[in-house]
Amino acid sequence: KEFVKNILLNLKKNKSTFSPVFIIGCGRSGTTILGNTLSNHPKIKYLNERRDLWHRAYPEFDIWNENTQNPKLYADKKDAISKKNNLLRHLFFREQVLGNSIILLEKLPINNFRLEFLNASFPDAKYIYLTRNGLEVSKSIEKRIQKRNWFGGEKYELLKKYSSDNNILFKTKINSDKEKGMWEWKLSIEESNRFFRKENKGNFIHLSYQDFIDSPSKKIKDILDFLKLDYTENWINKTSENIKRKNPETKKTEDKSLYLIGGDILNKTIDNSYTPY
């Protein structure tokens, strides 16, 4: 299978330019619906949480497996190793070429903690940065924690280590599952906010989940214009017709600890005024 894929890659690759685009956003922020929507475009090859490709090149990034040697949640440019990068870029480019696509779109929420690594490994990359009201994200993560399918492997311990390594302190204890959800969201958005505030504005587009749900046609057009991809009005209407909220909006909570954990950036996402620009 690998052999056949590589033969096909060699036959087709001269007509292609590797164009990686990463969807960035904390888990439960709407990255799945955004990725699935964009994947309908015929010139986009979408990799939806293809951990298998990542872990072939960087096995240490598999934080969900308890048998991983020295697992890494956070990664920056010093973690980018050229031999491993060559394999990762090869695997991604092969997916793009075999998909007859001109954009390779990738989504893996843990990449929020690996933005400096992505920048070093894929200097030609572009980013679609999606943010969502932290109250809604923490509520969604809480449900996942309770189903016991969120903090698999070493993820929880590595988030704690990341927090202490960076001297990130909170004004309240973090005990409940909802508080843990808010804590992960806060760590994640602070990391992406820091990165995008200094990133070249031409390399990324930012949108909120709220705006995507309220004006899907406009937001999809904005993204495709940013990626320089063609579309028809008919395609836009068809692609955006089923985009809607699954759960009611959350604008406030009685749980004061969530505001203490989320801080000012939480309030900005609640009133939909957050921007990294």
Question: For the regions a protein language model found, what residue spans apply to each?
Answer:
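PAPS-dependent sulfotransferase catalytic core
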Residues: 1-91, 98, 242-246
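PAPS-dependent sulfotransferases, especially Golgi type II membrane carbohydrate sulfotransferases
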Residues: 1-21, 142, 149-151, 155-206, ...
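Short beta-strand segments
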Residues: 23-25, 104-107, 129-131, 206-208
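Short catalytic/ligand-binding loop motif for oxyanion handling, primarily in non-cytosolic enzymes
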Residues: 32-35, 53-56, 112-114, 135-140, ...
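Acidic-histidine catalytic/liganding microenvironments
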Residues: 41, 122, 199-201
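Short, conserved active-site loop motifs that form the nucleotide-linked donor/cofactor pocket
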Residues: 44, 125, 202-204
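Glycine-rich phosphate-binding loop used to anchor ATP phosphates in small-molecule kinases
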Residues: 87-117
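Conserved phosphate-donor/acceptor-positioning beta-strand/loop module used by diverse small-molecule
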Residues: 107, 118-144
